């Protein structure tokens, strides 16, 4: 009997500790110092995934090697359109990641002074941008302008997120709301950057008055200097493979880029479209046997695929 009472009291105290808001000391135990390696790694992975999804049906399809090369080479003041896009989405992803991690209380020394695990914390991209500039620099020329464009976009991407602090007497009613500014999901910001990529302005390399030139370019326009290479052809260094052998799609229910992919990837580049049936196997008709073992059939399917040759 004594054991049962002791056991019950132990469970009660444990539940109380879980349900009770964390003290500031307990809260800080979850935090770690700012690691640029960690933040950059998470941000660049998010940027690459978004880039490859956005350009899946384009002649330049954001190959991993080229993406890494564009991020690792020394800054150039004569970037092409794709250089500019990769730099912009990479910066946006890194700052977005840093902003959210700060607000969520993951990083020591930034974010709310209160317990962010119990109290909603506003996103502050301005502070994250300051940290980014301290670490990576502010850049000059086209690079500097485009970084300011990304910073302005992140500032415009704040929206109000509210939760009910004091419920009303009637179900579903709220007497008092608590609202904080949070960044839009990264996917929405990536769509804005993709539109900026399409609308980017090409500048001449020489200008009689660079200061006046930069002052006249709005902070919602990315700029680039050089024409893009011919992505139909294979790059001599292997950064992109050209469009020969690339798969295209004739799926009428897909996006406009997907529906036009055979035209843009094959015919415009001087290739023909080859159609072939490909045999694929997949698991199907799965069911649990004896309540714990998964048993499946193997279904064979013929799929029609299109490619450039």
From Swiss-Prot:
Disulfide bonds join 51-62, 102-110, 112-121, 162-179, 164-174, 232-269, 248-262, 266-308, 284-299, 286-296. GO terms for biological process: canonical Wnt signaling pathway; cell fate commitment; defense response to Gram-positive bacterium; germ cell migration; neuron differentiation; non-canonical Wnt signaling pathway; regulation of embryonic development; ventral furrow formation. It comes from the Eukaryota. CDD domains: Wnt_Wnt8 (cd19340). GO terms for molecular function: cytokine activity; frizzled binding. The keyword Calcium does not apply. The keyword Signal applies. Residues 1-16 form the signal peptide. Pfam families: wnt. One of its GO terms (cellular component) is extracellular space. It is found in: Secreted, Extracellular space, Extracellular matrix. Keywords: Developmental protein, Disulfide bond, Extracellular matrix, Secreted, Signal, Wnt signaling pathway. InterPro entries: Wnt, Wnt_C. Binds as a ligand to a family of frizzled seven-transmembrane receptors and acts through a cascade of genes on the nucleus. Belongs to the Wnt family. This is Wnt inhibitor of Dorsal protein. It comes from Drosophila melanogaster (Fruit fly). The gene is wntD.
């Amino acid at each position: 009997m004594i054991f049962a009472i002791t056991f019950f009291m132990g469970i009660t105290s444990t539940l109380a500790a879980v349900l009770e808001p964390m003290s500031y000391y307990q809260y800080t135990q979850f935090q770690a110092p700012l690691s640029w390696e960690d933040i950059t790694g998470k941000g660049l992975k998010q940027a690459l995934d978004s880039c490859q999804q956005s350009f899946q049906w384009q002649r330049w399809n954001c190959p991993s090697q080229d993406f890494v090369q564009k991020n690792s080479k020394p800054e150039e003041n004569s970037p092409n359109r794709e250089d500019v896009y990769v730099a912009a989405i990479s910066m946006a992803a890194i700052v977005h990641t840093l902003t959210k991690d700060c607000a969520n209380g993951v990083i020591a020394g930034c974010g709310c002074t209160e317990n962010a695990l119990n109290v909603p914390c506003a996103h502050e991209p301005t502070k994250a941008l300051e940290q980014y500039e301290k670490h990576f620099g502010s850049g000059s020329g086209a690079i500097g302008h485009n970084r300011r464009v990304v910073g302005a976009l992140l500032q415009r991407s704040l929206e109000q997120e509210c939760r009910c602090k004091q419920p009303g007497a009637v179900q579903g009613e709220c007497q008092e709301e608590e609202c904080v500014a949070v960044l839009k999901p990264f996917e929405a910001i990536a769509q804005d950057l993709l539109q900026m990529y399409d609308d980017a302005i090409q500048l001449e390399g020489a200008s009689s008055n660079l200061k006046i030139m930069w002052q006249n370019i709005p902070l919602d326009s990315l700029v680039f200097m050089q024409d893009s290479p011919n992505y139909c052809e294979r790059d001599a260094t292997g950064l992109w493979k050209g469009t020969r052998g690339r798969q295209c799609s004739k799926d009428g229910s897909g996006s406009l880029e997907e529906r036009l992919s055979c035209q843009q990837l094959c015919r415009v580049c001087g290739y023909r479209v080859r159609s072939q049936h490909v045999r694929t196997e997949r698991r199907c008709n799965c069911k649990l046997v004896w309540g714990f073992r998964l048993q499946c059939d193997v279904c064979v399917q013929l799929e029609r695929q299109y490619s450039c040759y």
